[in-house]
């Protein structure tokens, strides 16, 4: 994974955490997106949780890459969930009606529970 991402596996769920507070640079977004798509396309991972805790801003390019990733995960019969969104970013998801597309959970624990993982 890129220096900007941290991944870990919890009982079959791949959790991706972001190191950057502001995800705005088009080149970085493209690189992160490609690496996350690789999790789906080459490693055949079907349960991916994106944890945005600590992320303060997402650009429109980041939203586009998330839509692309969500489609790829669904195409292989998987489920992508999102957690840890700041109120401002959650509001942007709602304004763009992306909350209708993505399964957004408040906490990582809530998301893992939705995958059937219990602590």
Can you describe what each PLM-predicted range is?
Residues 12, 87, 109:
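Residues that form or immediately flank small-molecule/cofactor binding pockets and catalytic motifs
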Residues 96-99, 109-119:
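A cross-taxonomic marker for long C-terminal extensions/tails that follow the last structured domain
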Residues 103-107:
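Short acidic-hydrophobic, aromatic-tinged amphipathic segments that line or gate anion-handling sites
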């Amino acid at each position: 994974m890129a220096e900007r991402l941290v991944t870990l596996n919890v009982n079959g769920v791949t959790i991706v955490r972001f190191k950057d507070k502001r995800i705005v640079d088009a080149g970085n977004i493209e690189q992160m997106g490609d690496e996350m798509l690789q999790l789906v396309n080459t490693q055949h991972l079907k349960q991916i949780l994106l944890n945005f805790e600590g992320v303060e801003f997402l650009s429109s390019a980041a939203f586009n890459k998330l839509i692309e990733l969500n489609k790829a995960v669904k195409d292989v019969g998987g489920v992508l969930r999102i957690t840890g969104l700041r109120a401002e970013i959650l509001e942007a998801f709602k304004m763009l009606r992306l909350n209708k597309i993505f399964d957004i959970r408040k906490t990582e624990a809530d998301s893992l529970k939705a995958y059937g993982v219990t602590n």
